[in-house]
Amino acid sequence: MVAKVNVDLCTGCGSCVDECPAAAISLNDDGIATVDESECLDCGSCEDACPNNAITIE
């Protein structure tokens, strides 16, 4: 399982970036969250932090 970002819902607020304990999330050049799947811990912190429900653990 890994965090997945719905690009249609992501506003680039950075809440997920701030909350990720593994530093596995960054904002791309378009301001959309991207997940480094090899670093993701599947902890759900980003999912909980996202105010737009743009991240799910799948």
UniProtKB/Swiss-Prot annotation:
<dbReference type="InterPro" id="IPR017896">
    <property type="entry name" value="4Fe4S_Fe-S-bd"/>
</dbReference>
<keyword id="KW-0813">Transport</keyword>
<keyword id="KW-0004">4Fe-4S</keyword>
<dbReference type="Pfam" id="PF12838">
    <property type="entry name" value="Fer4_7"/>
</dbReference>
<keyword id="KW-0411">Iron-sulfur</keyword>
<feature type="binding site">
    <location>
        <position position="10"/>
    </location>
    <ligand>
        <name>[4Fe-4S] cluster 1</name>
    </ligand>
</feature>
<protein>
    <recommendedName>
        <fullName>Probable ferredoxin</fullName>
    </recommendedName>
</protein>
<feature type="binding site">
    <location>
        <position position="46"/>
    </location>
    <ligand>
        <name>[4Fe-4S] cluster 2</name>
    </ligand>
</feature>
<dbReference type="InterPro" id="IPR050572">
    <property type="entry name" value="Fe-S_Ferredoxin"/>
</dbReference>
<feature type="binding site">
    <location>
        <position position="43"/>
    </location>
    <ligand>
        <name>[4Fe-4S] cluster 2</name>
    </ligand>
</feature>
<keyword id="KW-0479">Metal-binding</keyword>
<feature type="binding site">
    <location>
        <position position="13"/>
    </location>
    <ligand>
        <name>[4Fe-4S] cluster 1</name>
    </ligand>
</feature>
<feature type="binding site">
    <location>
        <position position="20"/>
    </location>
    <ligand>
        <name>[4Fe-4S] cluster 2</name>
    </ligand>
</feature>
<keyword id="KW-0249">Electron transport</keyword>
<keyword id="KW-0408">Iron</keyword>
<dbReference type="GO" id="GO:0051539">
    <property type="term" value="F:4 iron, 4 sulfur cluster binding"/>
</dbReference>
<feature type="binding site">
    <location>
        <position position="40"/>
    </location>
    <ligand>
        <name>[4Fe-4S] cluster 2</name>
    </ligand>
</feature>
<dbReference type="GO" id="GO:0046872">
    <property type="term" value="F:metal ion binding"/>
</dbReference>
<feature type="binding site">
    <location>
        <position position="16"/>
    </location>
    <ligand>
        <name>[4Fe-4S] cluster 1</name>
    </ligand>
</feature>
<comment type="function">
    <text>Ferredoxins are iron-sulfur proteins that transfer electrons in a wide variety of metabolic reactions.</text>
</comment>
<dbReference type="InterPro" id="IPR017900">
    <property type="entry name" value="4Fe4S_Fe_S_CS"/>
</dbReference>
<feature type="binding site">
    <location>
        <position position="50"/>
    </location>
    <ligand>
        <name>[4Fe-4S] cluster 1</name>
    </ligand>
</feature>
<dbReference type="GO" id="GO:0016491">
    <property type="term" value="F:oxidoreductase activity"/>
</dbReference>
<keyword id="KW-0677">Repeat</keyword>
<feature type="domain" description="4Fe-4S ferredoxin-type 1">
    <location>
        <begin position="2"/>
        <end position="30"/>
    </location>
</feature>
<feature type="domain" description="4Fe-4S ferredoxin-type 2">
    <location>
        <begin position="31"/>
        <end position="58"/>
    </location>
</feature>
